[in-house]
């Protein structure tokens, strides 16, 4: 019986592969003394690697805490780091929690006069260092905190830390995806952990809006020469000749002069006093 429970809670190969691909195990060169138990080993370059088995254990523990809260809206997920903004929004969408992506307004948990005052029962932060203001206010309001912690993250006022790489956009997206999947499984909305979830990890991945604009601009620039070439091919040789012929059909040249090429006075007067206004040129003289 105990072996079956251990097998159900054990880390699956698919989840391990996802963590390795998203580089969730790569830490930093600095290690907080409270984060040392979660470090597996360090590379020759001095980068500490995180034990993914303990990461999975903390994800299971955090999911059980989230499920224990009756109202999902009492769970607040925040991320001041831009890479985690899309992940927290997607997590709140599938789990039903509240999300704040962006700058944290001071006093949201402590100042009751503000319009944005909130009273959550659980706080989930992407980085306890960048979200330090929210973690500090949660300690004043007696709100438990779940945090994605790197090897150099401070664990002060953090109740449950999920050791992972909280600086990469792929790792942050995967951590929230795994946490959301586990919450839905414990609620009974997913039949089993082995059954693939129809929501992909890419839905939680942060995308740069400037990159989309850059791609659209390049696509427009590539399509512009083809459009100009297509318009140019519509004008064939026959169409151009017909157009020139039609444009020159109504044109008539000026009245021809005499055989000797001389201009008479009447012709000059009809043309608007040609030669009369020029000094040194007599009317009727040849040019």
Curated annotation (Swiss-Prot):
**UniProt similarity note:** Belongs to the universal ribosomal protein uS2 family.
Single GO cellular component annotation? cytosolic small ribosomal subunit
Tell me where it resides.
Cytoplasm
The record's subunit annotation is: Component of the small ribosomal subunit. Mature ribosomes consist of a small (40S) and a large (60S) subunit. The 40S subunit contains about 33 different proteins and 1 molecule of RNA (18S). The 60S subunit contains about 49 different proteins and 3 molecules of RNA (25S, 5.8S and 5S). Interacts with ribosomal protein S21.
List the InterPro entries hit by this protein, alphabetically.
Ribosomal_uS2, Ribosomal_uS2_CS, Ribosomal_uS2_euk, Ribosomal_uS2_euk/arc, Ribosomal_uS2_flav_dom_sf
Q: Which Gene3D superfamilies match?
A: Glucose-6-phosphate isomerase like protein, domain 1
* Gene Ontology terms: biological process: ribosomal small subunit assembly; translation
Q: Where is this region: Disordered?
A: 216-243
| UniProt key word Plastid | no
Q: What is this protein called?
A: Small ribosomal subunit protein uS2
Here the segments flagged for biased composition (Low complexity) are 227-243
Q: Enumerate the UniProt keywords alphabetically.
A: Cytoplasm, Ribonucleoprotein, Ribosomal protein
Q: What does this protein do?
A: Required for the assembly and/or stability of the 40S ribosomal subunit. Required for the processing of the 20S rRNA-precursor to mature 18S rRNA in a late step of the maturation of 40S ribosomal subunits.
PANTHER family hit by this protein: 40S RIBOSOMAL PROTEIN SA (PTHR11489)
């Amino acid at each position: 019986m105990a072996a079956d429970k251990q097998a159900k809670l054990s880390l699956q190969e698919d989840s391990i592969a996802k963590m390795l691909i998203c580089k969730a195990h790569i830490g930093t060169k600095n290690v907080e003394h409270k984060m040392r138990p979660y470090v597996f080993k360090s590379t020759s370059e001095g980068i500490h690697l995180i034990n993914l088995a303990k990461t999975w254990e903390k994800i299971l523990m955090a999911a059980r805490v989230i499920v224990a809260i009756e109202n999902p809206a009492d769970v607040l997920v925040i991320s001041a780091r831009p890479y985690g903004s899309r992940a927290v929004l997607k997590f709140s969408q599938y789990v039903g929690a509240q999300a704040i992506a962006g700058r944290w307004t001071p006093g949201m948990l402590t100042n009751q006069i503000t319009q944005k005052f909130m009273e959550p029962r659980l706080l989930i932060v992407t980085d306890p260092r960048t979200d330090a203001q929210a973690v500090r206010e949660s300690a004043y309001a007696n709100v438990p905190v779940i945090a994605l912690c790197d090897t150099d993250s401070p664990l002060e006022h953090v109740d449950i830390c999920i050791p992972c790489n909280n600086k990469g956009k792929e790792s942050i997206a995967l951590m929230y995806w795994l946490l959301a999947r586990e919450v839905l499984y414990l609620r009974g909305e997913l039949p089993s952990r082995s059954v693939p979830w129809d929501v992909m990890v890419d839905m939680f991945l942060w995308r740069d809006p400037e990159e989309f604009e850059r791609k659209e601009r390049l696509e427009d620039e590539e399509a512009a020469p083809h459009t100009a070439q297509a318009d140019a091919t519509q004008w064939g040789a026959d169409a151009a000749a017909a157009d020139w012929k039609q444009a020159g059909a109504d044109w008539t040249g000026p009245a021809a002069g005499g055989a000797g090429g001389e201009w008479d006075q009447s012709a000059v007067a009809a043309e608007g006093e040609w030669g009369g206004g020029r000094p040194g040129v007599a009317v009727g003289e040849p040019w």
